[in-house]
Regions:
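Glycine-rich Rossmann-fold phosphate-binding loop(s) that bind the pyrophosphate
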Residues: 17-19
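N-terminal Rossmann-fold NAD(P) dinucleotide-binding loop
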Residues: 22-23
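Conserved acidic E/D residue at the C-terminus of a beta-strand in Rossmann-like folds
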Residues: 40
Length: 197
């Protein structure tokens, strides 16, 4: 007996950050039959793949309710170590935590301390702090799925093709004197939303 097998269908998923990565993750989770709650920092419309939309100041009320918590945050002064010991401990003990945003949003020593206590039903990290993860980092000693954070390095042809297509599209928009897409507000560290373009 390998223990209980959990299904994605019917799972409650909390997606923290609804930028490009969060949107793609949410869309897939919804398609697999999950109930999706999205967390944003600013009010706005609720995407069709999100069942409920809450703001960041409500996150502590939402963390204990999720089967899966997906962190899709950028690295900003406000998000650095946002997931500290206190917030991580608010997740359910059997919660699956996924970080596909930036490693610095999670306080690694706090994460390890909770793992020592048997917290988390699963942990999937595409990003870590520090990155790359040194061989002597305690995270290597746990049952954690660590994936290489390679999407930005053109290690996959599809990533390279996407970046080239985005650059060509923006070059054409520039030549046509149209607003550029994929802009980032340097002050906030967040992408400028489409409705502001």
């Amino acid at each position: 007996n390998e223990g209980q097998v959990r299904s994605l269908k019917g799972s409650s998923v909390l997606i923290v950050g609804l930028g490009d990565i969060g949107r793609e993750f949410g869309w897939r989770m919804k398609a697999l039959g999950c109930t999706v709650t999205g967390v944003k920092r600013t009010p706005g419309g609720c995407p069709d793949y999100v069942d409920r939309l809450v703001l960041m100041d409500q996150i502590e009320e939402e963390l204990p309710n999720a089967d899966i918590v997906a962190l899709c945050l950028p690295s900003t002064p406000e998000t650095r170590h946002f997931f500290d010991q206190r917030r991580l401990a608010l997740t359910r003990r059997d919660c699956v935590l996924v970080n596909v945003g930036r490693g610095v949003t999670v306080e690694t020593p706090a994460l390890c301390a909770l793992l020592d206590q048997g917290h988390f039903g699963g942990l999937v990290l595409d990003v870590v702090d520090p990155e790359p993860l040194p061989m002597n980092n305690p995270l290597w000693g746990y049952r954690v799925i660590l994936t290489p954070h390679v999407s930005g390095n053109y290690n996959q042809q599809s990533t390279y093709d996407t970046v080239i297509a985005m650059a060509v599209e923006n070059l054409q928009r520039y030549l046509d004197k149209q607003p550029l897409k994929y802009r980032v507000d340097r002050k906030s560290g967040y992408r400028v939303s489409n409705n502001q373009e």
